[in-house]
Amino acid sequence: MNELRNDLLRYLTISATDEEWGIVVTTVGYQFIPPGCAYPLSRHPEKYNFKPQTGRILNEYQLEYITKGSGYFSSQSCKSQKINAGTMILLFPGEWHSYYPDRETGWDEYWVGFRGIHIDKRVEKKFFTKEEPLHRIGLSATIVGLYEDILKFASEEKSGYQQMISSIVLHILGSVYYKEKNNSFTNTYVVDKIN
């Protein structure tokens, strides 16, 4: 995994043609929160900023990937839980949530925000649910690379970049689903029960 040390936050413009693709990316970035630092950084636009004590509600989905450190997450549908490096958090539109790093460890996080009928359909069919927003997929250089690809295409903003980066988001979602389904059978208790 690349050790990027400068935070990068991108908030993207979306055209009517982009919307017709069925999924669009609204924001992408990464930030590194050292131990003892305030969270979140105050460089986000108002609709994305929040205080961990009060949380927030977004109008889009977001995939937050914690690659270093630990912290806490809670939402309207999920009680407070400890999260560690290797956890992917799926935030849902219209769902109150809060998350923050442990002050002793800080954390490194990548995120991508998105919306559209492709993800709405996957949620409707219960591939992803508000009750289970935490996906403990482990650390993956491949997934970090996908986030970095989104960042690269988003910073270049060439024609068709929205279609490219939103398709990468679908790849990440597929990877999360696959990893979680296959990780569940590494639990010896589950394997013993099946046998």
Language-model region placement:
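Short acidic-glycine-tyrosine-enriched beta hairpin
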Residues: 77-92
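Tight coil/turn sites that cap or link beta-strands
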Residues: 36, 47-50, 85-86, 94, ...
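Generic protein-terminus/edge-of-domain signal
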Residues: 1-74, 79-81
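Phosphate/oxyanion-binding loops and surfaces in catalytic or ligand/nucleic-acid-binding neighborhoods
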Residues: 28-31, 35, 117, 153, ...
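Amphipathic alpha-helical segments enriched in hydrophobic/aromatic residues interleaved with Lys/Arg
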Residues: 13, 121-186, 190-195
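Ligand-binding loop in jelly-roll beta-barrel domains
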Residues: 80, 94-118
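Short, charged/polar surface micro-motifs in flexible loops or helix N-caps
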Residues: 35, 68-70, 88, 94-96, ...
